Structure formats: structure tokens, C-alpha cells
Amino acid sequence: MPKKDRTDQAPSKDVPKPEEGEVICVVKKMLGAEHIIIACLDGKERTARIPGRMRKKTWIKEGDVVLAAPWDFQPTKADIVYRYMNDEIRKLIEEKVISRDVIDQLRG
């Protein structure tokens, strides 16, 4: 049997945008034990925790852009909600959710 032609593209999924209580951040440093330091768009540096559902499925490294949810009772800490891929970052820039300059500044 001949191979099927797979030229059709996968349906594009929606890029998660920050909702109330969430902020876009850039990973600054890996601390180990599933903890990282992130620099957020609101100007704060936080210690973030990678939840168990993301530990093996989503690999996070320094310089990645992530969506984080700061804790209500301890604002210097946060949980990682989502890691943006490069094409998703481009979509966020096109939709003017974030600017390229801010991301470059946070990445250092």
C-alpha cells in the first residue's frame, strides 16, 4: 500500500494567556529539587515550583518563558502553570500580550 500523504497541518491550539492571578515570567536559575528562580513581568523575582504533572512531561531550562501563578499567602513564591514554546511566544508578541524587548531584557 502507498504511504498516506500527510501534508495537512495539525489544528493550531490556543496559546494560554495570563488570567487573573497569573503572570508571564522567564526562568533565571535552576535550583534543583524541582525549584527555579523566575523573573516576572511585574518586576519581581520569585522562587517557583514545578508541579508533579509537569516534571517528566515538560522540561524547563534557563531562559524559557513560562506562565506562573504566584501564591496568595506568600507572594515571593509561585507555581509554574505552563511553558511557552518559541512559536507560542511569537503568537503572544503578535497579539501584543508581551513585547519582544521585555522578554529580551528578562532573559539578560
Curated annotation (Swiss-Prot):
What Pfam families does UniProt report for this protein, alphabetically?
A: eIF-1a
Does Protein biosynthesis count among this protein's keywords?
A: yes
Q: Name the Gene Ontology molecular function terms of this record.
A: RNA binding; translation initiation factor activity
This protein's record includes keyword Protein biosynthesis: yes
Q: Where is the S1-like domain?
A: 11-85
Q: SMART domains recorded for this chain?
A: eIF1a (SM00652)
Top-level taxon of the source organism: Archaea
Q: Which InterPro entries match?
A: NA-bd_OB-fold (IPR012340), RNA-binding_domain_S1_IF1 (IPR006196), TIF_eIF-1A (IPR001253), TIF_eIF-1A_CS (IPR018104)
Family the UniProt entry places it in: Belongs to the eIF-1A family.
Q: What does this protein do?
A: Seems to be required for maximal rate of protein biosynthesis. Enhances ribosome dissociation into subunits and stabilizes the binding of the initiator Met-tRNA(I) to 40 S ribosomal subunits.
Checking NCBIfam families in the record gives: eIF-1A, PRK04012.1-1, PRK04012.1-3, PRK04012.1-5
**PANTHER family xrefs:** EIF-1A
Name under which the protein is recorded = Translation initiation factor 1A
Species the sequence originates in: Metallosphaera sedula (strain ATCC 51363 / DSM 5348 / JCM 9185 / NBRC 15509 / TH2)
